[in-house]
Amino acid sequence: MSRYDLVERLNGTFRQIEQHLAALTDNLQQHSLLIARVFSLPQVTKEAEHAPLDTIEVTQHLGKEAEALALRHYRHLFIQQQSENRSSKAAVRLPGVLCYQVDNAIQLDLENQIQRINQLKTTFEQMVTVESGLPSAARFEWVHRHLPGLITLNAYRTLTLINNPATIRFGWANKHIIKNLSRDEVLSQLKKSLASPRSVPPWTREQWQFKLEREYQDIAALPQQARLKIKRPVKVQPIARIWYKGQQKQVQHACPTPIIALINTDNGAGVPDIGGLENYDADNIQHRFKPQAQPLRLIIPRLHLYVAD
């Protein structure tokens, strides 16, 4: 497929996402809102977009105010829709839930509508990340050449739909991206970097090359069977834990956008019990179960690369 055809499909798919989201938000407002609870988080400024989040203060919104914030959030796709001081790199998150009373016909209609939106979002992400054939560093410029100001993460994010929950609880999740590597795999990556000299602020080209050579020597000095691990922290994420009474099971969802809960009164479902979201404090985290960690030694800080002792 030619690059021109891909751009046409990209723009066409995005227009469909916008149209279907507009139709969904209009549709939801026609139905009976049983309960709505969302939690706005502080705005991340451009100056603080790379800073670690040690505390997050939560503001609760209820009822029609919460619904209005949620419906606007679903359609928040461009930086032009937010403050000029707000970071365009930090994710815009609004955890919470909207609960609507539905019958069988309305439930099926909304399920189909949301499924279609999620299919379009997945297709759009596939075009950008796979079909474009571009490395991650080049995708930003390519997407914004055709859709200026797009917040790509908001365009990718699918909507979460649940049916007849008994309870909904919110919380925070701290995660790490973990990848196991061999010594030779790391040496191969460093060798590629050494073969393409460049400057990386605040280092000059020569200083960066020297830094890479030192890293290469440190890894080469390890035994060939050394166990290496990238353990990169991910910014804390809001989550929702859903309990289904009939199935006697709990399901956990990431909750960057308000969940849509359909309460089917044809099937005798009742209004769920919805909890709040506490402020986040990194110094006050309680782990239900924390397994004994493997002893690790940091060897290349910029890569979050550790070696198992």
Curated annotation (Swiss-Prot):
Keywords: Cytoplasm, DNA replication, DNA-binding. It is found in: Cytoplasm. It comes from the Bacteria. Disulfide bonds: none annotated. Transmembrane segments: none annotated. GO terms for molecular function: DNA binding. One of its GO terms (cellular component) is cytoplasm. SUPFAM superfamilies: Replication terminator protein (Tus). GO terms for biological process: DNA replication termination. The keyword Lipid metabolism does not apply. InterPro entries: DNA_replication_term_site-bd, Tus_dom1, Tus_sf. Trans-acting protein required for termination of DNA replication. Binds to DNA replication terminator sequences (terA to terF) to prevent the passage of replication forks. The termination efficiency will be affected by the affinity of this protein for the terminator sequence. HAMAP family: Rep_term_Tus (MF_00483). Belongs to the Tus family. This is DNA replication terminus site-binding protein. The lineage of its organism: Bacteria, Pseudomonadati, Pseudomonadota, Gammaproteobacteria, Enterobacterales. The gene is tus.
